[in-house]
């Protein structure tokens, strides 16, 4: 078993019209044994920027703490929040710096940039970025997430439709992966508000 599959995970981000949504499952397991059913994988950097960390849970939490530290230093120095593109470069550099003993994480970054333009990207454990204009996925359920997102995604979705689409894609995907699931957590971010929602799924 790959170390990336040890805890199980499913993270997906999707772009709409001047908005984005990022979602994850809530299961923390040790291989096939379930340890927690309310585990957080999506973290806030600031009001318009979020990161989802799939992979090894301990590394995800350590990496998040280092990223918060770096972002707070940036805020003190620049007196403004980081743009999503800048933050993606920071995460990439941080991961590549540790390439010989990497954090076993695959980050998904989603944010609203200038003119409320949505930005999403993902990367591997050594910081190789993959930018997208529609959706990005990571985690043990990534294969089924790709299929679900490709069949359900439409460009320029309104926030309500985007929320429904990403929720359905996550739910149908984790049902096909025994290492992730136990409901989901969805964040919908528009220029004026942030909507958080816990969705119920199959609890097995």
From Swiss-Prot:
GO terms for biological process: proteasome-mediated ubiquitin-dependent protein catabolic process. Keywords: Cytoplasm, Nucleus, Proteasome. It is found in: Cytoplasm; Nucleus. It holds the Pfam family Proteasome. InterPro entries: Ntn_hydrolases_N, Proteasome_beta_3, Proteasome_bsu_CS, Proteasome_sua/b, Proteasome_suB-type. Gene3D superfamilies: Glutamine Phosphoribosylpyrophosphate, subunit 1, domain 1. GO terms for cellular component: cytosol; nucleus; proteasome core complex, beta-subunit complex. The keyword Endoplasmic reticulum does not apply. Non-catalytic component of the proteasome, a multicatalytic proteinase complex which is characterized by its ability to cleave peptides with Arg, Phe, Tyr, Leu, and Glu adjacent to the leaving group at neutral or slightly basic pH. The proteasome has an ATP-dependent proteolytic activity. Belongs to the peptidase T1B family. PANTHER family: METALLOPROTEASE TLDD (PTHR32194), PROTEASOME SUBUNIT BETA TYPE-3 (PTHR32194:SF10). The 26S proteasome consists of a 20S proteasome core and two 19S regulatory subunits. The 20S proteasome core is composed of 28 subunits that are arranged in four stacked rings, resulting in a barrel-shaped structure. The two end rings are each formed by seven alpha subunits, and the two central rings are each formed by seven beta subunits. The catalytic chamber with the active sites is on the inside of the barrel. This is Proteasome subunit beta type-3. It comes from Oryza sativa subsp. japonica.
């Amino acid at each position: 078993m790959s170390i990336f599959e040890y805890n199980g995970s499913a993270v997906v981000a999707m772009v709409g019209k001047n908005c984005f949504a990022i979602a994850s499952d809530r299961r923390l397991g040790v291989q096939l044994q379930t340890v927690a059913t309310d585990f957080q994988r999506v973290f806030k950097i600031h009001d318009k920027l979020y990161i989802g960390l799939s992979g090894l849970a301990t590394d995800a939490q350590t990496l998040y703490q280092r990223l918060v530290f770096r972002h707070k230093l940036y805020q003190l120095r620049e007196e403004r929040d980081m743009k999503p593109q800048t933050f993606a470069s920071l995460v990439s550099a941080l991961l590549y710096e540790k390439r010989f003993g990497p954090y076993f994480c695959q980050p998904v970054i989603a944010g609203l940039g200038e003119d409320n333009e949505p930005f999403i990207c993902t990367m591997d454990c050594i910081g190789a970025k993959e930018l997208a204009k529609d959706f990005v996925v990571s985690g043990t359920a990534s294969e089924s997430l790709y299929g679900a997102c490709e069949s359900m995604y439409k460009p320029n979705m309104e926030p309500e439709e985007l929320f429904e689409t990403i929720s359905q894609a996550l739910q149908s995907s984790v049902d096909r992966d025994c290492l992730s699931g136990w409901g989901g957590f969805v964040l919908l971010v528009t220029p004026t508000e942030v909507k958080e929602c816990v969705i119920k799924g199959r609890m097995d």
